[in-house]
Amino acid sequence: MNIQALLSEKVRQAMIAAGAPADCEPQVRQSAKVQFGDYQANGMMAVAKKLGMAPRQLAEQVLTHLDLNGIASKVEIAGPGFINIFLDPAFLAEHVQQALASDRLGVATPEKQTIVVDYSAPNVAKEMHVGHLRSTIIGDAAVRTLEFLGHKVIRANHVGDWGTQFGMLIAWLEKQQQENAGEMELADLEGFYRDAKKHYDEDEEFAERARNYVVKLQSGDEYFREMWRKLVDITMTQNQITYDRLNVTLTHDDVMGESLYNPMLPGIVADLKAKGLAVESEGATVVFLDEFKNKEGEPMGVIIQKKDGGYLYTTTDIACAKYRYETLHADRVLYYIDSRQHQHLMQAWAIVRKAGYVPESVPLEHHMFGMMLGKDGKPFKTRAGGTVKLADLLDEALERARRLVAEKNPDMPADELEKLANAVGIGAVKYADLSKNRTTDYIFDWDNMLAFEGNTAPYMQYAYTRVLSVFRKAEIDEEQLAAAPVIIREDREAQLAARLLQFEETLTVVAREGTPHVMCAYLYDLAGLFSGFYEHCPILSAENEEVRNSRLKLAQLTAKTLKLGLDTLGIETVERM
């Protein structure tokens, strides 16, 4: 149920009947304050200006054509021409019933699209670190939301699995006679990478052999391809452990590494030359883009092939966008890549559009994000100033959560305690990130993220268990409750019901903008409204059975909405804390 969309269409029709153009925007928004109703139409100002009349006068005319019978109990004009809409309690009650009768809580399925989501993208032969966390969990929340809405989502893990470093790694693997690389763990492989690099820098004979191996690998020699595959498999097997711990839906099947596009690069360069978009410049192949200027104010040159014949990330990203449209048949492509890559992506996509590889009707969207900072406001590092490994961060989260839940539940059995600590610890790390606007940097703070108050995972998980506990005490079966009507008489009942019915609107924003923090804010607000409702509208001690069961149904929809909302974020819920 999308009340905002329903009201927007009703107000738009009334505006057209009052003389507004057919493309007018009613600008219906959820009201910021209760006194302004549940929704507010703010579009009169802009339209009245075009019509040469006072906004309030237009609002009055719109009201004469606006039929919200059975939807709103009151509609009024406020200020210079805002239209405040107060939803009818009977309308709310009816739709709460409908939401409870549906597995999807009344959420409609939009027109199905094929959406490619590019996220996570770790590098081969390196362990995942905190720099991979944001892309991985924000991208996964977007994927979960889009899939819930019914879209076909293709996860694309753009792994860094190609490049000159593989010659060096294969040469070192050979030198160490570690043919059985499958048994190596990634922690060893990380040290292995460092040793290989040191050797490469210090031993010219070894470096020369490594360079020859790159050529052999790139020419498709089976022995070198097999060695390369071993390195990729070891890395991704270890990364899968991290994905599983993070409750992220990526699997080995979602790997679409840089190597996938490698065979396409010569054809891309040749085609861009044939189309007159790429030219030779100082031995390299370059595309000059008018949209981007260099320091001298001239069109910026984007290199797609170096003098030595090597290709660049831009070339790969051009091939990648083309592949996603032509082969994967994407209707929309989302990239969860940090904000520092913005200009690079914009340049690659400008070339993609000019070459006609992806039509303008298919959006390529950079859902960029800021950095994770320590309490000192600087990039998050270890005490020694090194990069924090993701596995170490999750270990610490688990350890801190273990202490926290053991303190609150001294008699809980060990296996139950471990399960709860895992849900709280991993949930806390993820929610702390997801609850912030992805476009900004955020401060990583253990105390804040593990707090049981405020917009945190432990608070949300506790809020969910609190609602469930009402049912345990009520001792009523679901069938009995299903037959009971919903009656809304109190203001707090109406406020909670209206917010519950805004779940679909929240999902729609997250799906459109790729902003999971909007879902976090919604769920936190919902938990707060339930708290106020619980305090002021007795449930178990209600004046009669009819009111008791009606309030239990509002509690039931609250629990289902919290659980489903947290699930779209990849946050685990628990039944007891």
Curated annotation (Swiss-Prot):
Keywords: Aminoacyl-tRNA synthetase, ATP-binding, Cytoplasm, Ligase, Nucleotide-binding, Protein biosynthesis. It catalyses: tRNA(Arg) + L-arginine + ATP = L-arginyl-tRNA(Arg) + AMP + diphosphate. GO terms for molecular function: arginine-tRNA ligase activity; ATP binding. It comes from the Bacteria. It is found in: Cytoplasm. GO terms for cellular component: cytoplasm. Gene3D superfamilies: Arginyl tRNA synthetase N-terminal domain (3.30.1360.70), HUPs (3.40.50.620), Isoleucyl-tRNA Synthetase, Domain 1 (1.10.730.10). The keyword Protein biosynthesis applies. It holds the Pfam family DALR_1. GO terms for biological process: arginyl-tRNA aminoacylation. Its EC number is 6.1.1.19. A motif ('HIGH' region) lies at residues 122-132. Its main location: cytoplasm. Monomer. NCBIfam families: argS (TIGR00456). Belongs to the class-I aminoacyl-tRNA synthetase family. HAMAP family: Arg_tRNA_synth. This is Arginine--tRNA ligase. It comes from Escherichia coli O157:H7. The lineage of its organism: Bacteria, Pseudomonadati, Pseudomonadota, Gammaproteobacteria, Enterobacterales.
